[in-house]
Each structure stands twice: as structure tokens, then as C-alpha cells.
Amino acid sequence: MSTPDNRSVNFFSLFRRGQHYAKTWPMEKRLAPVFVENRVIRMTRYAIRFMPPVAVFTLCWQIALGGQLGPAVATALFALSLPMQGLWWLGKRSLTPLPPSILNWFYEVRGKLQEAGQALAPVEGKPDYQALADTLKRAFKQLDKTFLDDL
């Protein structure tokens, strides 16, 4: 994955960007074969919900059985890091510039939105996946569901 051109991003702001990207990305089944985001977002949400209880259970189980605490702590830390890994990946992905094939498709979707009378802000610099997510979300809200068939 390439890094953004002239954008300096704080490590912790990547998590916020990842959360925003996960909320913005349209979870449409028709996008799943083309983009990996549907699976990553679903798994990240699952990890946010279930990994903290798994970590607590692992620690409590080892303490209750009088087992070694070291491996239990390592397992708990790994379980707690899984949601963070997903959010970090989503944050990095949101800043990644679009490849040429998707870039053409992005401009076609924007063109369809403008033809439908939607006012769109001009694209600054090279569009990234966050801009694609914003455009797709708006397209699924404003346009007919068949707009993907024409592209």
C-alpha cells in the first residue's frame, strides 16, 4: 500500500480516520467482490465487540486455575490489539491514493451524481479511498441502485 504524498499523519489520528472510514464506507454486497473493505470493517466491528471479553475471560481463567499468568497476559494483549489493527489498517487505507483503474470509476460515479443535479465539492489533489467512500455513500443515497450496472 502506498503512503499519501505530502500528508503527515499522527499515529493516533489513524485510528480516528479508520473509525470515520468504517462509518462512511457503504456496506453494499455489490461492492464486496471489488473492495476488501466490507470484510475488514465487519471483522473490525466484530473484534471491537468480542475481543475485550475474550481478553478478560483469558485472564480470569488462568487466575482461577492457578496457571501461568504470562501467557494469559500475552493472549489478552493480542486479543485487545486485533480491533486496533483493523482500525489502523482502515485509517491507512483511507489515505491511500486511488489506483488508475478505480480513479476512472470514481470520476464516472461523480459524473453520474453531477448529472443527477447533485452539487459536489471539487476534488483537491489526487483522490483517496476516503473520497471514494464519501462519493459512493452519497451515490447509494441519491442515485438509483442500478448506477453500478452502467459502470
From Swiss-Prot:
Q: What is its main location?
A: membrane
* UniProt topological domain (Periplasmic) ranges: 66-68
Q: Which UniProt keywords apply?
A: Cell inner membrane, Cell membrane, Membrane, Transmembrane, Transmembrane helix
Cellular compartments per GO CC:
plasma membrane
Topology Cytoplasmic: residue spans:
1-45, 92-151
Q: Which InterPro entries match?
A: UPF0208
> Where is this gene product found?
Cell inner membrane
Matching entries from Pfam families are given as: DUF412
| Record carries keyword Lyase | no
Q: How does it sit in the membrane?
A: Multi-pass membrane protein
Presence of keyword ATP-binding: no
Transmembrane feature ranges: 46-65, 69-91
Q: What NCBIfam families does UniProt report for this protein, alphabetically?
A: PRK01816.1
What does the similarity note say? Belongs to the UPF0208 family.
Q: Which HAMAP family does the protein's record reference?
A: UPF0208 (MF_01101)
- Its protein name is UPF0208 membrane protein YfbV
